[in-house]
């Protein structure tokens, strides 16, 4: 048995699933026009030639189309999932069959998760990655924390969660096996593109502290990501996940959505579309007012906790649903999270109670008061744990942004310092334009006089950087 996952060519659940994965890839490509257009546009110039990309993002069918786009543009890629439950095993097998090293299985342990995160940085010839494509910031954090530990081992002395216990153990294991590796690996990185709200928050925190070691592109805040993937994606995938997990009818049920950002908005719309009566909690008066204007009642959780049938956290914060909240819920209330990390719900504290596993990613938690809750995906991303995530079309927009961000950082690295950037408006509009034909949309074209009148180029960009959409 090898010491590290990195020593193996790949780790997937079952290579016999590859044929099934390839069939789904063929279907997904039809729904992902942005990525397919980039393959055609850049097939000759190969802008990612020489890039060694460490990818940490849900290993789904849609991600497979992203991976094959990156390699079609010249990149070498190694991949792991950014969530222990989100891998689609047939997709992982089909990618491994192409020769791309993949380290991902649905239901992997936390120990395996961090071993796989390590594996994406190691090339067989001894080279390390020179680019990161991240979702949630775990791959980026692994390198940065690892280098800190090389200089000061005490930073690993006091893990604050089960997750940190395994992360710290993996870092110690790598330092013991390859002293100085983290400093070398971090120094080789030319840039990172970050997919999601939580990971972007980590990057901005590092920038504020002066600790960001390489340029970063915030893909999440591209309009064609956050206003589409986060909202319209969740609008389709949340109810899908709850239905697959519970078979509960949502019409007439009371649902409480924590947070009314883009993900919360999509989640509330998803539940309302299924006939649920939706309530919202918020800390931000602007988002709270938006929720009211959209027809949702804004409440405090403690005032309604015993009335609700369904609870969905979507804040990106921690300790949103506490054990005390869950002890006060009605019998068989459904509890789930659609934010990136599992600490929105105090799942670790629930380990003190009796659990009954119903089926994969569905558990009953029994409280001494005599009631139970239905916990989905152990508090991790419900739409990827209990279902298959967002539809291919909306992910095409997100992943087209990711590909453009990788090209930008790799080919124009000299233009970027160690700060967090957003893709320019003309690329955001390009991503949108690449998806219009699929929907049969036809743009109106400004006349020269009209363009002059409103002070924009005839063919865009059409909005100022501060425009909010």
From Swiss-Prot:
Residues involved in substrate binding: 60, 135, 195, 225, 229
Pathway recorded for this protein: Amino-acid biosynthesis; L-homocysteine biosynthesis; L-homocysteine from S-adenosyl-L-homocysteine: step 1/1
GO cellular component, one term: cytosol
NAD in keyword set: yes
Catalytic activity, as annotated: S-adenosyl-L-homocysteine + H2O = L-homocysteine + adenosine
CDD domains: SAHH (cd00401)
Enzyme class label: hydrolase
Entries under InterPro entries matching the protein: Adenosylhomocyst_ase-like_sf (IPR042172), Adenosylhomocysteinase-like (IPR000043), Ado_hCys_hydrolase_NAD-bd (IPR015878), NAD(P)-bd_dom_sf (IPR036291), S-Ado-L-homoCys_hydrolase_CS (IPR020082)
Main location group: cytoplasm
Cofactor binding mode and count: Binds 1 NAD(+) per subunit.
GO biological process: L-homocysteine biosynthetic process; one-carbon metabolic process; S-adenosylmethionine cycle
Reported function: May play a key role in the regulation of the intracellular concentration of adenosylhomocysteine.
The protein's name in its UniProt record: Adenosylhomocysteinase
Organism in which the protein naturally occurs: Maricaulis maris (strain MCS10) (Caulobacter maris)
UniProt gene name: ahcY
